[in-house]
């Protein structure tokens, strides 16, 4: 930047005037030390208050420390545009040129426009914002379009003031409405609108700054962007306006009159050891102390709000706990009642069971006894019926009898008979029978006195006569072994389906001279 400005001395850039060194300026020299006529003193006071609010609005954030080192440190400039020492006054003829006017375009570059006049552009834009008031509403878009038209219509703007020839920066309507408004009396506002160019460019010598200055321009205040502090100011002003413990911001920006502080602010000022300001305008020390006190009050309000919310949350939780506890107790009571009722019902059920068993056990036992008796009688009747049918079943009755051999009778059977006979009956041992286990020897058949052989059934034994009993057994065995073998279609138990006897095929044999027995 120095290389760009070397071919252009201060006399060529600003003929007939000298400009101040930017290294000697601080944050309070741009907006607080401008000299205006007496009828514009209110504007100077308003600009001083506005500059202080604008510069310190960055430190209103409660996140920052109260004793921020940024408040006491010296701000550095990017690069000073002018290094030479100049006088502290400007005449109407030597107003600084606008970057819109070409000054030897063959020797200058775009860096000069953005470097040497960047601070002036931002400064003038801040001053233009401050002029807006409720008495004269200005549309930002219309004003910017009008200023742009005027700039295009009149290229040489050397005769205009820096405030009037710089366009208003474009901002959203919401941001423009949030700017603090300075109340001004109508007569003074009309006088401000009629000022001349000579009155605007008259500037007194700047007193030495509190931060000091250096010849090489290493320390100078940085240019503050106009749009960035607007939003924090809007947020803080909204918080202040909603709090009853803080004074409204428009009351602190008055030019004259008494200053009415809240009781909380006064108490905090006394506790911090600061004097209580009573009149406007405020000094820098008073303003700094008041800002610190207001910041503490804001922190206190936010802490109270957080504690209030926490208390409400805890109270809500306590109410829920009480409600749930009462419901739990009621449920426990219901459970105990149900358990008691269950025990009572169980006892009644046991009593009923004992009563029922005591009353029903005797008839049940009697019925069971009667049933058993009936079954036994039925079984006995069945046995009797079977017993009555036993004579009709020779096969069943003959199988259970035991054959007794009589050795004397067996010898007499196979002995040669002295009596003449047609044939000799014999039993072939080679021919199998269906009852091999009951084979017996042939016994002599001698019918007893008064006994006749029945062809349809077995002979009925007579135990009173031993001889007759033996003869009956021998006759029965003879008839069993000498008859025809059973057919092939007999059942497994050896019984024939029909009890018809085969035809007679045996020969007659004379047993004696007097008796002849016909065997079947």
Swiss-Prot record:
Residue ranges annotated as motif S1P recognition: 422-425
InterPro entries recorded for this chain?
bZIP, bZIP_sf
Compositional bias (Polar residues):
86-97, 235-245
Q: Where is this motif: S2P recognition?
A: 391-394
Compositional bias of type Basic and acidic residues: which residue ranges?
501-511
Presence of the UniProt keyword Membrane in the record: yes
- The location annotated for the cross-link Glycyl lysine isopeptide (Lys-Gly) (interchain with G-Cter in SUMO2) is 183
Glycosylated residues are: 498, 514
Tell me where the transmembrane regions lie.
376-396
Residue numbers for the site described as Cleavage?
Answer: 425-426
List the subcellular locations: Endoplasmic reticulum membrane
Membrane topology qualifier: Single-pass type II membrane protein
Q: Which GO terms describe its molecular function?
A: cAMP response element binding; chromatin binding; DNA-binding transcription activator activity, RNA polymerase II-specific; DNA-binding transcription factor activity, RNA polymerase II-specific; DNA-binding transcription repressor activity, RNA polymerase II-specific; sequence-specific double-stranded DNA binding; SMAD binding; transcription cis-regulatory region binding
Q: Which key words are in the record?
A: Activator, Developmental protein, DNA-binding, Endoplasmic reticulum, Glycoprotein, Isopeptide bond, Membrane, Nucleus, Signal-anchor, Transcription, Transcription regulation, Transmembrane, Transmembrane helix, Ubl conjugation, Unfolded protein response
Is the keyword DNA-binding in the record? yes
Q: Name one GO biological process term.
A: negative regulation of gene expression
Q: Where is this region: Required for transcription activation?
A: 1-60
Q: Pfam families, alphabetically?
A: bZIP_1 (PF00170)
Question: Lumenal face: residue ranges?
Answer: 397-520
> Which residues lie within the region annotated Leucine-zipper?
331-352
Q: Which GO terms describe its cellular component?
A: chromatin; endoplasmic reticulum; endoplasmic reticulum membrane; membrane; nucleus
Renumbered residue ranges of the record's region Disordered: 72-98, 201-258, 446-467, 484-520
- Subunit structure and binding partners: Interacts with SMAD4, the interaction takes place upon TGFB1 induction and SMAD4 acts as a CREB3L1 coactivator to induce the expression of genes involved in assembly of collagen extracellular matrix.
PANTHER family associated with the record: CYCLIC AMP RESPONSE ELEMENT-BINDING PROTEIN A (PTHR46004), CYCLIC AMP-RESPONSIVE ELEMENT-BINDING PROTEIN 3-LIKE PROTEIN 1 (PTHR46004:SF1)
Name the protein family.
Answer: Belongs to the bZIP family. ATF subfamily.
Provide the protein name. Cyclic AMP-responsive element-binding protein 3-like protein 1
Q: Which organism is it from?
A: Rattus norvegicus
């Amino acid at each position: 930047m120095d290389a760009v400005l070397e071919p252009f001395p201060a006399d060529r850039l600003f003929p007939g005037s000298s400009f101040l060194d930017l290294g000697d300026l601080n944050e309070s020299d741009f907006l607080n030390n401008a000299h205006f006529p007496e009828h514009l003193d209110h504007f100077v006071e308003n600009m001083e208050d506005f500059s202080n609010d604008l510069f310190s609005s960055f430190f209103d954030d409660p996140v920052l420390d109260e004793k921020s080192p940024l408040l006491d440190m010296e701000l550095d400039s990017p690069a000073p545009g002018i290094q030479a020492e100049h006088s502290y006054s400007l005449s109407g003829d030597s107003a600084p040129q606008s970057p819109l006017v070409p000054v030897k375009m063959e020797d200058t570059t775009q860096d000069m426009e953005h470097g040497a006049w960047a601070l002036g552009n931002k400064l003038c834009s801040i001053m233009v914002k401050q002029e807006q008031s409720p008495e004269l509403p200005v549309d930002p878009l219309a004003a910017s379009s009008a200023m742009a038209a005027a700039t295009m219509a009149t290229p040489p703007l050397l005769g205009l003031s820096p405030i009037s020839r710089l366009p208003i920066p474009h901002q959203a309507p919401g941001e423009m409405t949030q700017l603090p408004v300075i109340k001004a009396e109508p007569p003074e506002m009309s006088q401000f609108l009629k000022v001349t160019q000579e009155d605007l460019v008259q500037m007194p010598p700047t007193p030495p700054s509190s931060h000091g200055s250096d010849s090489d321009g290493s320390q100078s205040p940085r240019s503050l962007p106009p749009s960035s502090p607007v939003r924090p100011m809007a947020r803080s002003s909204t918080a202040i306006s909603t709090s009853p413990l803080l004074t409204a911001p428009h009351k602190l920006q008055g030019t004259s009159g008494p200053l009415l502080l809240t009781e909380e602010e006064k108490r905090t000022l006394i506790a911090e050891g600061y004097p209580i300001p009573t009149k406007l305008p405020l000094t820098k020390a008073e303003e700094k102390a008041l800002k610190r006190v207001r910041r503490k009050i804001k922190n206190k309000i936010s802490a109270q709000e957080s504690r209030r919310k926490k208390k409400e949350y805890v109270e809500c939780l306590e109410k829920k706990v009480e409600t749930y506890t009462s419901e739990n107790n009621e449920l426990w009571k219901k459970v105990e009642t149900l358990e008691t009722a269950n025990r009572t019902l169980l006892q009644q059920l046991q009593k009923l069971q004992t009563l029922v068993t005591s009353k029903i056990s005797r008839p049940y036992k009697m019925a069971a006894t009667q049933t058993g008796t009936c079954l036994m009688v039925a079984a006995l009747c069945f046995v009797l019926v079977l017993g009555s049918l036993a004579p009709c079943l020779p096969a069943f009755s003959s199988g259970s009898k035991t054959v007794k051999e009589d050795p004397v009778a067996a010898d007499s059977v196979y002995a040669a008979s002295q009596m003449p006979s047609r044939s000799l009956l014999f039993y072939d041992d080679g021919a199998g029978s269906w009852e091999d286990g009951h084979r017996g020897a042939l016994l002599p058949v001698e019918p007893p006195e008064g006994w006749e052989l029945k062809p349809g059934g077995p002979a009925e034994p007579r135990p009173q006569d031993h001889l007759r009993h033996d003869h009956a057994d021998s006759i029965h065995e003879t008839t069993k072994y000498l008859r025809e073998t059973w057919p092939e279609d007999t059942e497994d138990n050896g019984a024939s389906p029909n009890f018809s006897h085969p035809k007679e095929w045996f020969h007659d044999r004379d047993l004696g001279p007097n008796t002849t027995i016909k065997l079947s």
